[in-house]
């Protein structure tokens, strides 16, 4: 889908990526910005991928993208926003509770998230 818009890129029309699993590809194709929810949890990886793409370091960009994708794979199984808020809480950042009609994670979901974050090295 990104390729379809590249011919229209100009000073008047910039490409912005909103799909966290496509950040590297979008930036390498000339995308100008990222709108990301998971960057709240792993901001350093997003800064690293941006620097790698700007430096032409495709290997590092790929490694960063794989890290982003591992986290996305972990949190898309259930409530995305609740998982992001819970991830931040597990990292010591209080992002507040979910507002109705949404709900916070159940204990078993929180345990799966915590173990998953440890497995992908977002928690120790």
Where are these regions (language model features)?
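Ligand/cofactor pocket segment of small-molecule handling proteins
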Residues: 1-32
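Structured C-terminal cap/extension of enzyme domains
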Residues: 21-124
